[in-house]
């Protein structure tokens, strides 16, 4: 073996598996060494001459010539442990070869510029090489397109006798599962059998992992889906033989909280520092929606070290059997280095009876203080509550407001315990009669029900409404002379029969079933009726000073508020008519009865 026939940089210590390349340069390698292709100028190539045969082993002759094929296996980079490219060449035009089994004869018609013509360059991952017949030294090449060809070794006279054994060893090195660093090395024959070219691998994306150990500088084509993990990977053949250091960074400031069922519990996930506190703030804000089914979305942005801004948006629904049909919540949160503040505003659907605002302060130690301010019949409005929440009032101030509201409600509830019992008894008695009367009457008769006991004892004549007179006749009402004379003395003031059922209905909160448009119309009618009732009270209380009438009205309003609050606590539903005039009207009529 002459030193000139070896590649300049190749030695036997380059790799045990590459010892087969420590042979004399073949025709293909000598031709490429001339520099026709720079990538193969110093590439070690193991090549031999073959003749093309059929599957049955018959020689294929085209125009009475044997088809000669020179196949070479090359390694394009010295750092690759295995070869990665297969080269196919044929005799150039002007150089014809006729080969037999174990013998070769040449006849040159003219002097050719080159002996071989390179026709194919295929990565070994797209080719499966196998032994077709060991005795006849036949190989089988199966390409990724599905086509196959069969080659029979045709060595020269001066070649080694164990040349085919080297090919078998090379095939064995390319067949095992890939555990090398090169992605362009040959894929195992069994795995490559049914894989078409450029067809996506049907394996699950979760099962696909990067193949290789140590300094991985190339990846398999089967891992090309995983863009985030193979970014920056390249072939060492075109990088000057230098490996690349891969450092796949993962985002650290990403917060993604998904809560299928809104609750106060947060999934146990590894989180540190800012991310953990932002997630805890989102979970605490989600508690405003209760335990109803819904979804809560939390988005966090890290504006500065130790500071996080959180935006919260969520929806909630209750089944057909529930009292509410939907619910919505929206809020913002800001986290300082030592504490977390959350402001949440929610709205409930179906009756639109309550709008609440929640403010929370969360410290690093884990203690949490929560204050809730809501809209009540006699408390602040929803707009004021939202303004306080947006302004960021201190927690102590909001807590004091909430506690005062709760104490006032408890006092009114205790004072109206007896009135609640009366209201319950009257509602049970009048439920059947109230349903039938509501269907037949419209307009002003909607505020009145049949079975009025007060109308049978005392009712006034009205010249303003004929419908009220007809209702009085149907219900067998008797007009009072005193009240009639009083009605004639006041010009422009109409008197209608006062029904006990109507007072009971207003007192028990029956008006919650009407719409907001109907309530606005009723307020206009009731305002005129209030003036009439006040006039009646003034006429009856002869010799009573004006200051007493004012006291009576104040007591009436206080009593009406107590009844409304007690019914809200029992039924769990708020009243729709929350105007301050409605309780005045209802309880004024009640005072006249008692």
Curated annotation (Swiss-Prot):
Residues 408-433, 442-455, 468-477 have a biased composition (Basic and acidic residues). RAB2B effector protein required for the compacted Golgi morphology, probably through interaction with small GTPase RAB2B. It comes from the Eukaryota. Keywords: Golgi apparatus. One of its GO terms (biological process) is Golgi organization. It is found in: Golgi apparatus. This is Golgi-associated RAB2 interactor protein 4. Residues 396-406 have a biased composition (Polar residues). Its main location: Golgi. GO terms for cellular component: Golgi apparatus; nucleus. Residues 510-521 have a biased composition (Low complexity). InterPro entries: GARIL-like_Rab2B-bd. Pfam families: GARIL_Rab2_bd (PF12480). Interacts (via N-terminus) with RAB2B (in GTP-bound form). Residues 390-525 are annotated as: Disordered. Belongs to the GARIN family.
